[in-house]
Amino acid sequence: MKICTIYNMIFILLLSLNFMLKANDLAVMKVADVPAKALYVTQPKGEVDRLFVLNQKGMVYIIKNGLTLETPFINISDRVHGSLTPGSEEGLLGLAFHPDYTKNGYFYLNYVNKNDSSIVSRFSVTNNPNIADEDTEKIILGLPQPYGNHNGGHLAFGPMDGMLYIGFGDGGKWGDPYNNAQDLNSLLGAILRINVDKGDPYSIPNDNPFINERSKRAEIFCYGLRNPWRFSFDRKTNDLLIGDVGQDLWEEVNWLSWEESFGANFGWRIMEGNHCYNPEDFCDTTGLVMPVFEYPNNASYLKILIGMDEREATGCSVTGGYVYRGAENPHLWGTYVFGDYCTGRIWSFTLNNGKPVKFRNLRPELKKHSKDVPLFISSFGEDSSGELYVVDYLGAIYKFVSNQ
């Protein structure tokens, strides 16, 4: 009788362990196909059955209950830069819904216009919740771009303060030739923080780090960034996480508490990752914030575009992600998930005393348990409940799920 009881206990233990292992296996499930050049997916606060997908050509599409609606939510293709060759960094780049979207119907777009300026504008939804009014555009901010790359473009409302955060790259070309990212009189190479609920078209929050310094732009929240293509806030801790695309050798992830981010200098062009860039040796790192993680830029995007196999390389363009705070994948709780655009690799880690721990290469696991996986990771996204999605630039939206 005792022997049977012991065997039963062992069997139950092994069964439980097997269930736990299976429950911890991650997969991605395709939510919907969307038009190619997909750049971002998001959801307004309180929404449950619709996802909004940003398209570089100038449209925002709606996925409703797994189906992509044929008519775009908004189409401003007549205003965005139209020459979108492979690898182009212009077009419609950012989307954020106002925290009170359900009441005021406001949302914000960041795009590069036909005159090569970055434009951040507010639009309004119509009485039809699936259609916005293109004619309601109110330009909030315009910024001439000296070159056609490193435009940044991401928009996000702070989860705690409700301010609008805007990411801009250094203005492009090789090595930030004008040193914009270290110039506090320039809005390039920085993340801005503005109040769109006060002032016309906006006001500067009283606690912005440079608000009382005349020689510095008061909109700047943090700087020293080459191309912060995607950044995010941990919705639980308010930590700021930035995927900053590198120059030649290193891609980097920055992770700071919100309080430490005020006025933070992330180092570009003095540093690329944790390494001196300009000057190449003996650079002065005083006051610079070093990335918590870096990986080598060793994949050729041009080779990938023409079909050559570069998938064994690590990557060439970091895509910043999110700290998972959803309920469907509890083993991911508190884990930062991010990837690389060129190789489709997806990684995760958590932070302990400023150091990355529990690092995982998720792509083999996802390939094993998923019907298919994204190839060109242009963005990650969250829904209103904190569940995590990934965007394939070629035109598909995937959701992270547990393989059970």
Across the structure, where does each feature detected by a protein language model lie?
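Bacterial Sec-dependent N-terminal signal peptides
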Residues: 1-24
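Short, conserved catalytic or adaptor-binding loops enriched in Gly and charged residues
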Residues: 21-24, 129-133, 210-214, 285-286
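Acidic, Gly/Ser/Thr-rich repeat motifs that build Ca2+-stabilized beta-propeller blades
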Residues: 23-175, 230-233, 238-246, 250, ...
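Beta-propeller fold detector
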Residues: 29-30, 69-78, 131-141, 203-209, ...
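A conditional alpha-helix N-cap/helix-loop micro-motif detector
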Residues: 31, 145, 221, 369-370
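Beta-propeller domain segments
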Residues: 46, 57, 85, 90-92, ...
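Conserved blade-ending motifs and adjacent loop-strand segments that build the rim/top face
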Residues: 225, 356-384
